[in-house]
Amino acid sequence: MVIGLSHYLTVSAILFTLGVFGIFLNRKNVIVILMSVELILLAVNINMVAFSSFLNDIVGQVFALFILTVAAAEAAIGLAILVVFYRNRGSIAVEDVNMMKG
């Protein structure tokens, strides 16, 4: 059995759906929201690499590496902001984020 493009697209669609459900079903926890966004970005990367391989083009794979780099930076900055917010407020609830106004 050969793993074809449809298998990669199915896995990507499942990951994307899980990410969207994670955002909509759990709006109270910032960490779960960040993890759901990372799942969505991973699904996009799988699509990029699958179509790049299917079309014999390297541009999609290079762009997927760029997206991974930006996603890693986004996760690091988001978690750093979350740690500072927890130290100041003692909670990471989404409802308390509106208190961050300057």
Curated annotation (Swiss-Prot):
GO annotation, cellular component aspect: NADH dehydrogenase complex; plasma membrane
TM region(s), chain numbering: 5-25, 31-51, 65-85
Pfam families noted in UniProt: Oxidored_q2 (PF00420)
Record EC number: 7.1.1.-
Broadest EC class assigned to this enzyme: translocase
Catalytic activity, reaction form: a quinone + NADH + 5 H(+)(in) = a quinol + NAD(+) + 4 H(+)(out)
GO annotation terms (biological process): ATP synthesis coupled electron transport
InterPro entries, sorted: NADH_UbQ_OxRdtase_chain4L/K, NUOK/Mnh_C1-like
GO molecular function: NADH:ubiquinone reductase (non-electrogenic) activity; quinone binding
This protein's UniProt keywords: Cell inner membrane, Cell membrane, Membrane, NAD, Quinone, Translocase, Transmembrane, Transmembrane helix, Transport, Ubiquinone
Membrane listed as a keyword: yes
Record's subcellular location: Cell inner membrane
Membrane topology listed for this record: Multi-pass membrane protein
Subunit structure comment from the entry: NDH-1 is composed of 14 different subunits. Subunits NuoA, H, J, K, L, M, N constitute the membrane sector of the complex.
Function: NDH-1 shuttles electrons from NADH, via FMN and iron-sulfur (Fe-S) centers, to quinones in the respiratory chain. The immediate electron acceptor for the enzyme in this species is believed to be ubiquinone. Couples the redox reaction to proton translocation (for every two electrons transferred, four hydrogen ions are translocated across the cytoplasmic membrane), and thus conserves the redox energy in a proton gradient.
NCBIfam families according to UniProt: PRK05715.1-2 (NF004320), PRK05715.1-3 (NF004321), PRK05715.1-5 (NF004323)
PANTHER family: NADH DEHYDROGENASE SUBUNIT 4L-RELATED, NADH-UBIQUINONE OXIDOREDUCTASE SUBUNIT ND4L
Protein name as annotated: NADH-quinone oxidoreductase subunit K
Biological source species: Rhizobium leguminosarum bv. trifolii (strain WSM2304)
